[in-house]
Amino acid sequence: MKSSSSIFRETSEKKSERWMMMNIGRFSPFFLSSFCITLFFTGFFVYQNPFKSIADQNVLSFQPQIDPECDLFKGHWVPDKRGSLYTNSSCATIPDSKNCIKQGRPDKDFLFWRWKPDGCDLPRFNPKAFLSMVRGKKMNFIGDSVARNHMESLLCLLSMEETPKDIYKDGEDRNRIWYFPKHDFTLSTSWTKFLVEERERRDSNNTGTGLFDLDIGKIDEGWFNGLPNTDIAIVSAAHWFFRPIFIHRGDETLGCIYCNLPNMTQISPEEGFKLVYSAVLRQINECEMCKKDLVTVLRTISPAHFENGTWDTGGTCSRTSPFGENKIDLQSNEMKIRKSQIEQLEGITKRGNKAKKFAVLDVTRVMQMRPDGHPNGYWGNKWMKGYNDCVHWCLPGPIDAWNDFLMAIIRQLR
C-alpha cells in the first residue's frame, strides 16, 4: 500500500507533466534548442561518454536472463561441438606450461564439453558483454598459481574482443597487470600462498625446510595493500595448505597441520582453512580504506586428480573424458574444505557490511568431474622429468567455464 506522501508526489508530478504538454507550444525555438543542448552536455559530463553507456546497455539487454533461484553449480557436463571461444594458437598470452596442445597432447575431446546446471542454463561467456559490465573497473585475482591460471583463461577470452596492454610484470613474473584501454578495464593478479602472513622455516644452511608458520592475525600485505584500489576481488588459495604448517594468532600457537608432534594440537586442513578464511574475509569486510561497493568473490578449492601416486611419486591424470555425477566423492578432503570455505563466507554475509558484496564461485564439485582437463605430462617440463601437473588446467579447457560462472555472478550483483 502506498503512503499518502508518495501518492501526493505522484499526483503533483502528473499535473506538472500535463502543464508541460499543454504549454510546450509557447516555448520559443531558442529555448528548445538550449534545452536540448543542455540535456546533451549534462549527459556527457555525468556519464563521461553517453554513447558508450548506451552501447553497453544494448549489449547487456540481449544477454539471457538467469533464474536467481537456480543453483548454477549443481549439474553435469554435456557435449558441446562449439568448443572454446579461443584456441591454443589464437590466444598469444597462454603460458607454455598450460598450452597442452602445443606441448603435444594428442586428444582434443576435453575441449568440447560445457557445464549444464540442473533446471536452467548457464549463458556462454560473452567477452563484449563482460567488458561492458566491468568498464572503468579494476579486477584482481588474489591467490596462488591456480588463481593465475583462472586469470589467464579470462585474459584469453577477453582478448577475443580487445587486445590488452601488458603494463606490469614483477621480477618473478608472479604479479601481472593487463589494461584494456577501450574499456578502461584493469585485470591483474596478486600472488600469495596462504592469504595471511607466512614464513618458511630454514635450516642451518638457510635452505627452506618446507615447514611454514602462518599468523592469521596479519594479512599478507603483498595483496591486501592493493585492495583499496580494487573494485572486484577474486580470492582463492588452497594448494599450499597440504604440508606441515604451524598456525599462530600473534604470539599464540593454535596448532599444526600435518605435524604429529607431541604436545601440539593437531589441526585438520579444513580447520586450517576455516581459521585462515575467517580472518581474511573479516579483514576484507572491515577494510575502511576499501571502496564501499567492493565485490569479493570467493573461489572454492579446485580439485587435483592425481592417480597411482602423488605429484612427487609418479602420480598421473591421463583420463580423456569427464566423470559422471556418480563418480563424485562427497566425503573427499576437497569437499570438506569447500564446505569450510562457504561457511566462513556465509558467516560474513550474515553479519557483514551490507554495502560490500560477497559471492561464491563454487567450482569444487564442478571440477571434480573433469579429471581430463589437466596438463598431466604435457606442460613443457624440462627440469622436472617424471613430474606431472594434475593441479592446473589446460588452456583452453574446462577452466574456461569458471568465467561463465564469473560473468553470471557479476551480472547478478549489478
UniProtKB/Swiss-Prot annotation:
Glycans are attached at residues 88, 205, 263, 308. GO terms for molecular function: O-acetyltransferase activity. A motif (DXXH motif) lies at residues 389-392. Its main location: membrane. The active site is at residues 145, 389, 392. Disruption phenotype: No visible phenotype. Loss of O-acetylated xyloglucan oligosaccharides in seeds, but no effect on xyloglucan O-acetylation in roots and rosette leaves. PANTHER family: PROTEIN TRICHOME BIREFRINGENCE-LIKE 9-RELATED, XYLOGLUCAN O-ACETYLTRANSFERASE 2. Contains 2 motifs that are conserved in esterases, but it is unlikely that this protein belongs to the catalytically active pectin esterases. This is xyloglucan O-acetyltransferase 2. The gene is AXY4L.
